[in-house]
Regions:
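Active-site diphosphate/adenylate-binding microenvironment
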Residues: 60, 64-128, 139-144, 151, ...
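Active-site glycine/GP-rich loop and adjacent strand/helix microenvironment
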Residues: 3, 31-85, 92-100, 108-111, ...
Length: 539
């Protein structure tokens, strides 16, 4: 009876079924032509329009963010102690809330980790990002609230895609897989009421399950703590996938990609993943690695897009492929303030909100976020290149510098000097660190650079001379101290064995994840350890 009834109904509605079939065929055909990316791109259009306010109303956006943060903070112990309920303006906020380092918030964060609620942010915060820091820093545990997770970190990821698709309308980004290279959890730091891990591990753990359909590697592989094992498994798992985009820290991603080529026997990555089109990178400067990536990926359609994301938040995105500066993200639940670098550490530094910054000046960044960080010194330094919209470049870290003799050498100077020397000599630098030699047996002072080359210069001496010359060009204080070799002698370059820096990190249990090499330091502790290891035969 059922089949008979079905047949009668089929005959009765045959014209409609035929019409529906034609429509379905048309939809499927158009979907094949349009690609999944073309369809998905439409979901990003509203946000692309919202981002126009960054050009027209940037200061207003920041006022809205501050109002939101203070109103939420009223319901916390910190807010009550600092009179949040009586605040009506930025001046009230600046007057009542002190600038904080991690050490000044640590006791409150420790209480939150043990389950106390409404301390720095309303409710209970379960997740904590273990800050990578340097190899000799004590760990920091940065709270990641549900609001911060969604409205800062995940929103940053969405906006990266929105801006990329805006700039590349022919993209096929969603027609393949995303290779996302992350860190791991840190169970040894867990307490009963909280979970600790690298930020990237927290993001993978909490990501929308639908994203896992287009993400590689498998979750259990992505969260492995043994980087060498993780690298090998990622390479094998992703080898035969249609990878269209990769995301991660340039140094660690390079290690994975080299392994992929070793296993595949191919020379270039486009021979493995012909549809690879973009690398979303952040965490460290990309300049020292660009040439290496261009050698591994020779496809003219390959794009590179920088992001500024950290355990504390997601702050910037490169919105123009022809401009290396990044757009400051203004509506994420992050309120920004800035301290002129030369005033960092002074008793009463000048602190300005966004509208008070000057183009070309170096600032240390202070953030207030929906994760409960109130006027928090993040330790990064930036320089604005534009105010319409607000765009900037990262110039270094407040603790990564050499100023042993008044030369005030920062990471931005170092990166420019290395890029110039590499360009002129054809060399490629994979890792480096530098520190002062305060006085040798001949009473001479200089900077000592330990450099691991992925491609050696023809002459290390020529490379050294070019680096020294360029540092004088970009830093007048260094130039003055180098004048006639009176204060500073010409810098020294020591060539590191291949793999030295990774072996150093490995011995400290910090290989992979978000761990970084400290580039510049007034202290010789790191470089002396590395120089001693450099005497060993590592391979």
């Amino acid at each position: 009876m059922f089949y008979f009834s079905l047949h009668i109904n089929y005959c009765k509605y045959l014209p409609r079924f035929q019409s529906l079939a034609v429509n379905l065929q048309s939809i499927l055909y158009n979907a094949q032509i349009m690609s999944l990316t073309s369809i998905a791109s439409k979901f990003f259009l509203p946000r692309q329009h919202e981002l126009e306010r960054y050009f027209t109303q940037p200061e207003e956006l920041q006022k809205e963010v501050l109002h939101y943060l203070v109103s939420k903070g009223c319901n916390t112990e910190y807010g009550r102690n600092h009179l949040f309920s009586s605040m009506d303006s930025y001046d009230d906020f600046a007057q009542n809330v002190p600038v904080n380092t991690y050490e000044e918030l640590k006791d409150d964060i420790d209480r939150m980790r043990h389950g106390e609620t409404n301390v720095l942010w309303p409710g209970q915060v379960k997740w904590y990002a273990k800050s990578s820091g340097t190899t000799n820093d004590k760990s920091k545990f940065i709270p990641v609230s549900p609001e911060g997770l969604q409205n800062i970190h995940y929103q940053g990821g969405k906006d990266v895609v929105a801006l990329y698709l805006r700039n590349n309308p022919q993209s096929r980004l969603f027609d393949g897989r995303s290779l996302i290279l992350g860190g791991s959890h840190s169970p040894n730091y867990n307490v009963q009421d909280s979970i600790v891990g690298d930020l990237s591990a927290i993001l993978i753990e909490n990501i929308n399950p639908l994203v896992n359909l287009i993400r590689v590697p498998k979750k259990r592989t992505a969260l492995l703590s043994d980087f060498e094992l993780k690298r090998d498994r990622i390479a094998h798992e992703c080898l035969h996938k249609n990878v269209t985009n990769i995301s991660g820290v340039p140094s660690w991603m390079m290690s994975v990609l080299v392994r992929v080529l070793e296993i595949s026997g191919k020379k270039h990555l486009e021979d493995v993943w012909p549809n690879l089109e973009v690398f979303f990178h952040g965490g460290i400067a990309f300049t020292p690695y660009r040439k290496q990536y261009e050698q591994l990926i020779t496809s003219p359609k390959m794009h590179y897009m920088e992001t500024y994301n950290a355990s504390e938040g997601f702050f910037g995105i490169q919105d123009d492929p022809d401009d290396s500066s990044m757009l400051l993200m203004l509506d994420y639940g992050v309120f920004y303030e800035f301290i002129p670098v030369e005033e960092v550490g002074t008793p009463h530094p000048t602190i300005v909100p966004l509208e008070g910054v000057e183009i070309g000046r170096n600032y240390a960044m202070v953030i207030t976020t929906s994760c409960g960080l109130w006027r928090y010194e993040i330790g990064d330094t930036v320089r604005f290149t534009s105010k319409k919209p607000y765009k900037f470049v990262i110039t270094g870290r407040t603790k990564y510098f050499i100023n042993a003799f008044g030369e005030e050498l920062i990471m931005d100077n170092a990166e420019k000097g290395l890029a110039y020397a590499c360009e002129k000599t054809g060399a490629q630098v994979s890792e480096y660190t530098a520190a002062p030699v305060y006085m040798d047996a001949n009473a001479k002072c200089r900077h000592q650079w330990l450099i691991e080359f992925s491609k050696d210069p023809d002459s290390v001496e020529h490379f050294r001379d070019l680096l020294d010359q360029q540092l004088q060009t970009v830093n007048s204080d260094y130039e003055a101290k180098r004048f006639h070799d009176v204060t500073l002698q010409k810098l020294e370059v020591v060539v590191a064995q291949k793999g030295l820096f990774n072996e150093w990190l490995k011995r400290k249990g910090k290989l992979g994840g978000q761990h970084k090499i400290p580039r510049l330091s007034n202290s010789r502790k790191n470089i002396d350890e590395l120089l001693e290891m450099n005497k060993e035969k590592l391979v």
